[in-house]
């Protein structure tokens, strides 16, 4: 039975809350509905940056010491406002939406310690929006020994079924962290994080220019890549690890950045993202013949050019060019995953997160 789901995603880029409507039975995508966006205020972003810094000390997934409790309240309120605005704008009644998938804000992800922490109060959200909410998508996988990420691949597969393309397809999601899904038209589904997405570049832009990101990659297009630094950065042990594998937003934060000009730094860090994605190819059964780029990185024209160079001769195109939505993809995915979780269907697999067996997930909070 098809359900109407709203998915909510607040990624590691800390830019805001993506909202998307999807009709799905948890196996197939019936229709993609409208999408929306509620940006975080600079005050909220600052609070979340503090929460990320303090979360490094966490040893329990339900602990909310200090600023984390305040950040959780802010995240919950922002998501409630995002849903309220989306429902009003699209003239939906709460009764017309069956379920909301609420990812929350990841502040710590350490699967080796069986610890992943997403802040956001699902019970308070369900009460505020008067719609049942599924949350806590990653915890069961991590508790069972999986990486807890990426979770979107099963949604990528559902979308790719409608393309009818020959040969393997790779779907690249460039958020704060980048990840790749490998789909070959059979039951094979392989996925992993590939390295930094927008996080290093966004942090660099904020530190050097006070800007949240490099709009369309304009600054990077004017810079010169520091090839020596790039070669050294690609020696990071993460890149040689077999799939599946996952990252925390801060796993590359200790890389020593040089005293670049803003343009050269942007060019170098954008190239690092592209080359890190290309480095996953030898770890896949066959190189994909076509790549589809989603997430905020699909809007970065310089990154798209660098990906085409790094992944040639394969084709590289934005999800938007296929009628998908590069911006709404992850939000749609969590609507899809909420429906799968309600039905007890797997969210993760051995070749996507390394979990020992297909694993469902998610907890239900009722209004």
Curated annotation (Swiss-Prot):
It is an enzyme of class 2 (transferase). Keywords: ATP-binding, Carbohydrate metabolism, Kinase, Nucleotide-binding, Transferase. The keyword NAD does not apply. Its EC number is 2.7.1.170. Pathway: Amino-sugar metabolism; 1,6-anhydro-N-acetylmuramate degradation; Cell wall biogenesis; peptidoglycan recycling. GO terms for biological process: 1,6-anhydro-N-acetyl-beta-muramic acid catabolic process; amino sugar metabolic process; peptidoglycan turnover. SUPFAM superfamilies: Actin-like ATPase domain (SSF53067). ATP binds at residues 11-18. GO terms for molecular function: ATP binding; kinase activity; phosphotransferase activity, alcohol group as acceptor. Gene3D superfamilies: 3.30.420.40. It catalyses: 1,6-anhydro-N-acetyl-beta-muramate + ATP + H2O = N-acetyl-D-muramate 6-phosphate + ADP + H(+). Signal peptide: none annotated. The keyword Protein transport does not apply. It comes from the Bacteria. Belongs to the anhydro-N-acetylmuramic acid kinase family. Catalyzes the specific phosphorylation of 1,6-anhydro-N-acetylmuramic acid (anhMurNAc) with the simultaneous cleavage of the 1,6-anhydro ring, generating MurNAc-6-P. Is required for the utilization of anhMurNAc either imported from the medium or derived from its own cell wall murein, and thus plays a role in cell wall recycling. This is Anhydro-N-acetylmuramic acid kinase. The lineage of its organism: Bacteria, Pseudomonadati, Pseudomonadota, Alphaproteobacteria, Hyphomicrobiales. The gene is anmK.
């Amino acid at each position: 039975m098809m359900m109407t789901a709203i998915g909510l995603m607040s990624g590691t880029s800390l830019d805001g809350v993506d909202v998307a409507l999807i009709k799905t039975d948890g196996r197939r995508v019936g229709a993609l509905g409208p999408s929306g966006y509620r940006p975080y205020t600079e005050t909220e972003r600052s609070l979340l940056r503090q929460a990320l810094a303090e979360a490094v000390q966490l040893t329990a997934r339900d602990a909310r010491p200090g600023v984390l409790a305040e950040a959780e309240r802010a995240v919950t309120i922002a998501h409630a406002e995002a849903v309220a605005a989306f429902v009003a704008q699209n003239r939906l009644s709460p009764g017309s939406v069956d379920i909301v998938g609420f990812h929350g804000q990841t502040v710590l992800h350490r699967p080796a310690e069986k610890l992943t922490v997403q802040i956001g109060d699902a019970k308070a959200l369900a009460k505020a929006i008067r719609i049942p909410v599924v949350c806590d998508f990653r915890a069961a996988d991590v508790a069972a020994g999986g990486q807890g990420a990426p979770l979107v691949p099963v949604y990528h597969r559902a979308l790719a079924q409608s393309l009818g393309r020959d040969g393997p397809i790779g779907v690249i999601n460039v958020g704060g962290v980048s990840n790749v899904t490998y789909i070959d038209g059979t039951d094979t589904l392989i996925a992993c994080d590939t390295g930094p997405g927008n996080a290093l570049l966004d942090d660099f832009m904020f530190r050097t220019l006070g800007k949240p990101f490099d709009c369309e990659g304009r600054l990077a297009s004017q810079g010169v890549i520091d090839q020596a630094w790039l070669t050294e950065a690609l020696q990071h042990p993460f890149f040689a690890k077999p799939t599946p594998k996952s990252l925390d937003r801060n796993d590359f934060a200790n890389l020593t950045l040089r005293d670049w000009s803003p343009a050269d730094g942007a060019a170098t860090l954008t190239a690092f993202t592209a080359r890190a994605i290309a480095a996953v190819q030898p770890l896949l059964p066959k190189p994909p013949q076509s790549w589809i780029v989603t997430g905020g990185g699909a809007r970065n024209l310089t990154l798209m050019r660098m990906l085409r160079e790094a992944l040639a001769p394969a084709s590289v195109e934005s999800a938007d060019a296929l009628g998908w939505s590069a911006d709404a993809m992850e939000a749609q995915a969590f609507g899809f995953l909420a429906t799968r979780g309600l039905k007890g269907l797997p969210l993760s697999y051995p070749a996507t997160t390394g979990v020992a067996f297909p694993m469902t997930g998610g907890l239900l909070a009722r209004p």
